[in-house]
Amino acid sequence: MALTSSVKEELSRLDIKKSSVRKAEVSAMLRFAGGLHIISGRIVIEAEVDLASTARRLRAAIAEVYGHQSEIIVVSGGGLRRGNRYVVRVVRDGEALARQTGLLDARGRPVRGLPSAVVNGSAADAEAVWRGAFLAHGSLTEPGRSSAMEVTCPGPESALALVGAARRLGIQAKAREVRGVDRVVIRDGDTIAALLTRMGAHDALMVWEERRMRKEVRATANRLANFDDANLRRSAQAAVAAGARVDRALEILGDDVPDHLKYAGELRVAHKQASLDELGRLADPPMTKDAIAGRIRRLLAMADKRALDLGIPGTEANVTPEMLDE
């Protein structure tokens, strides 16, 4: 599954209880995926998304949070557009929902950005804004030189609101116009990882981080065509750095770390030079390479999320310059 789809599928399954957070997400989804139409003299809301799971999430939230009914219309792909699209349409209560979600102001005029209640909301509301915007019109490219998280925006006002929401989370995003289309873009790998964590896409983050590490290893291998003793020492330093991250993860989580993740982490720390295959064979009972790698990735992601919530340094804090020294 493509990275963008895997992030959206995971976010669509995320269980959110707090009403204000769900409202912020719905407002963002309708703003970034939707539009207002006048049909037979009444206001109709339509929001077009690319995944059925996203459409179902939006429809459920509209019913559960606002008490309005909607329908999902499947638009078959054709021409340059691949795959089906899904339109969530609110007809009967379109105007009421538009006012409730900030698409219309108190005088019935269209709002170009996001409603002030959302813009000035909590950090959880800011996370919900990004979650809704990404579900509506976001994309995530493969890690590498041109990696980016991007959201296409309906206008400059909504783009600036999204940049502001990121800023409230301590994340730097840039608004730019490309060929007449407003976009908000994040290119820094660590920043992308932090935002995936804040949105709640922890499984997708682990996949993205794994691919990112592979790219970095491959790039390093390409640069070092002829290995000498110094290069071999650097490889050993990288392994030590990985063990240091796990050390920090165990320290952050303390007694809260699940036993199976703790066991995988302790194996990594105890055998810093071992490959994942070797770690799997050292486990009791033995595990596959993918199983041990998955547990270590989940341990690091869980620790970094906890560190982010507590406002303390994450797992990278244990990686010293000497470990990365070339």
UniProtKB/Swiss-Prot annotation:
Disulfide bonds: none annotated. InterPro entries: Homing_endonucl, Sporu_reg_WhiA_N_dom, Sporulation_regulator_WhiA, Sporulation_regulator_WhiA_C, WhiA_LAGLIDADG_dom. Residues 275-308 bind DNA. One of its GO terms (biological process) is cell division. Keywords: Cell cycle, Cell division, DNA-binding. GO terms for molecular function: DNA binding. Transmembrane segments: none annotated. It comes from the Bacteria. HAMAP family: HTH_type_WhiA. Involved in cell division and chromosome segregation. Belongs to the WhiA family. This is Probable cell division protein WhiA. The gene is whiA.
